[in-house]
Curated annotation (Swiss-Prot):
Protein name: Large ribosomal subunit protein uL4
Gene responsible for this protein: rplD
MF annotations from Gene Ontology: rRNA binding; structural constituent of ribosome
Annotated stretches, region: Disordered: 43-94
Pfam short name (any one): Ribosomal_L4
PANTHER family the UniProt entry points to: 50S RIBOSOMAL PROTEIN L4 (PTHR10746), LARGE RIBOSOMAL SUBUNIT PROTEIN UL4M (PTHR10746:SF6)
SUPFAM superfamilies assigned: Ribosomal protein L4 (SSF52166)
Skewed-composition ranges (Basic residues): 59-70
A Gene Ontology BP annotation from the UniProt entry: translation
Family: Belongs to the universal ribosomal protein uL4 family.
Gene Ontology cellular-component terms listed: ribonucleoprotein complex; ribosome
Compositionally biased tracts (Basic and acidic residues): 49-58
Role of this protein: One of the primary rRNA binding proteins, this protein initially binds near the 5'-end of the 23S rRNA. It is important during the early stages of 50S assembly. It makes multiple contacts with different domains of the 23S rRNA in the assembled 50S subunit and ribosome.
Keywords linked to the UniProt accession: Ribonucleoprotein, Ribosomal protein, RNA-binding, rRNA-binding
Length: 206
């Protein structure tokens, strides 16, 4: 199969041969959903803290005697049943959100994403993608000429000028094939891949 070549002026050029094993697979929506959710879950870190009955500030004095008042027995005011008491199952920053995804499943999901991008015309090949200086304006002008606004660039080797120029653009990311993740691939409107990076992607996902 072929991937369309995108020129610097935004015009579509001749096709570039690509492996149908990576870019011609059927779309498995359930698998893609699973690996995207797992990727987001694995990026989470615990940032919530609630106190249990041992941690809330309280007195250990018994609120009233055990028998004879007609009220339900109570041991201390830190009980989770009381207003201001501790939580029974409190949130903790040590919570583990990790979801395991097997290598075969991950590769199959990535192949499915790349294939769907190719079908939708959201992935294009470029001969190379560089800027002369680490200036955001140079890169912004280049994207404007190409008619692009939300772009993920997958390059075979990270160019320092390109990386520095892209950091201040809100909808642009530059990665190497090994760093491409399922969330970024589905998030950006357009994915640009250098010719050498296509071969690296095929090698990673074969």
């Amino acid at each position: 199969m072929e991937l369309k070549l995108l020129q610097d002026n935004g015009q579509i050029g001749a096709g570039v041969d690509a492996s149908p094993e990576v870019f011609g697979r059927d779309y498995n929506e359930a698998l893609v959903h699973q690996i995207v959710v797992a990727y987001q879950a694995n990026a989470r870190s615990g940032n919530r803290k609630q106190k249990d009955r041992e941690e809330v500030k309280h007195t250990t004095k018994k609120p009233w005697r055990q028998k004879g008042t007609g009220r339900a027995r109570a041991g201390m005011s830190s009980s989770p049943l009381w207003r201001g008491g501790g939580r029974i199952f409190p949130n903790s920053p040590e919570e583990n959100f990790t979801q395991k995804v097997n290598k075969k499943m991950f590769r199959a999901g990535m192949r499915s994403i790349y294939s769907q991008l190719a079908r939708e015309g959201r992935i294009n090949v470029v001969d190379g993608f560089t800027v002369d200086a680490p200036k955001t304006k140079l890169l912004a002008d280049k994207f404007k000429a190409m008619g692009l606004d939300s772009v993920l660039i997958i390059t075979d080797s990270l160019d320092e000028n390109l990386y520095l120029a892209s950091r201040n653009l809100p909808h642009v990311a530059v990665v190497e094939p090994r760093q491409a993740d399922p969330l970024s691939l589905v998030h950006y409107k357009k994915v640009l891949v250098t010719k050498a990076a296509v071969a690296q992607i095929e090698e990673l996902l074969k």
